[in-house]
Amino acid sequence: FFRANLYESNLQGANFEKTNFTSANLTRANFTGASLIEANFQNANLVEANFTSANLTGSRFEGANLNNAKWTDGRLCEAGSIGECK
């Protein structure tokens, strides 16, 4: 999924272990309950993505835009969240 455009995709409950989402457009993607173990989200656009209850163990987010994304614990990432949910 390198550089893929998955804008508003419903990926709920999917298994994406070790998947490469580098530089992908995942704006408003729904990853609720997904298995994303060791997934690579480097430089991905994850604005308003939903990671509620997703497993992100070992996943990489360097340079990823997480503005207003919903994190695994349900909190919203603040504006300016690049590389990590703040």
Per-region residue spans from a language model:
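Tandem repeat scaffolds
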Residues: 1-86
